[in-house]
Amino acid sequence: MDIVQSSIDTLNHFYEISGVEVGQHFYWQIGGFKVHAQVLITSWVVIAVLLGSATIAVRDPQTIPTGGQNFVEYVLGFVRDLTRTQIGEEEYGPWVPFIGTMFLFILVSNWSGALLPWKIIQLPHGELAAPTNDINTTVALALLTSVAYFYAGLAKKGLGYFGKYIQPTPVLLPINILEDFTKPLSLSFRLFGNILADELVVAVLVSLVPLVVPIPVMFLGLFTSAIQALIFATLAAAYIGESMEGHH
């Protein structure tokens, strides 16, 4: 009987784990619209963290940077080098703020899933998680990137920008048009899938072995989250550079 009862308890435990829900959402009703409140709340927190950190770090700038100012200048230099490499020496300047904002928002959003105690905030439906854990956020970021590289191409070449769709031959017109749809799709689903999978793996491991085992996985998740932010920012800059250069 003890063996049977133990087996039943084990099955019940796995049943509870399988009940982890990823589709429950908390909405605010504003007029005739439903607003996805979870994403807004966590996104506002991430934005507040970024603005607060930047304000504190540079509130008393020094000629020889130290501490927070030194870190901010290092990040700025990293983003500037990344943007210059992908867009080019002559055109990269105006795009540093955009690429830097994308990189930092995605990085802090990804890390917030592991470093911020979202679970202690109870909602009527669903639960708070990293903003990039939601497909709405990643699609919005990808669409912003699409708007950016269309704007970059049109600002540089005018209507001649659309000539790229028939290069090197008009036969490739459908494929070149399709490419503009696949870019935001790949950007959004790559980021969403990686962050969601990471948080689900950690949640399951914490349910199974709540002490030591999840810690290395969490550190691995922080590393992969940083890589995903870097990949997104690099591809965004590459697409913008490509639209201004007019070649693939």
Swiss-Prot record:
Cell compartment(s), UniProt: Plastid, Chloroplast thylakoid membrane
InterPro entries attached to this UniProt entry: ATP_syn_F0_a_bact/chloroplast, ATP_synth_F0_asu, ATP_synth_F0_asu_AS, F0_ATP_A_sf
Chief place of localization: plastid
Any one annotated GO CC term: proton-transporting ATP synthase complex
Keywords in alphabetical order: ATP synthesis, CF(0), Chloroplast, Hydrogen ion transport, Ion transport, Membrane, Plastid, Thylakoid, Transmembrane, Transmembrane helix, Transport
Coiled-coil ranges from the UniProt annotation: none
An example molecular function term from Gene Ontology annotations: proton-transporting ATP synthase activity, rotational mechanism
Source superkingdom: Eukaryota
Transmembrane helix recorded as keyword: yes
TM region(s), chain numbering: 38-58, 96-116, 135-155, 200-220, 221-241
SUPFAM superfamilies attached to this UniProt entry: F1F0 ATP synthase subunit A
Topology in the lipid bilayer: Multi-pass membrane protein
Role noted for this protein: Key component of the proton channel; it plays a direct role in the translocation of protons across the membrane.
Entry similarity comment: Belongs to the ATPase A chain family.
Subunit: F-type ATPases have 2 components, CF(1) - the catalytic core - and CF(0) - the membrane proton channel. CF(1) has five subunits: alpha(3), beta(3), gamma(1), delta(1), epsilon(1). CF(0) has four main subunits: a, b, b' and c.
Protein name according to UniProt: ATP synthase subunit a, chloroplastic
Name of the coding gene: atpI
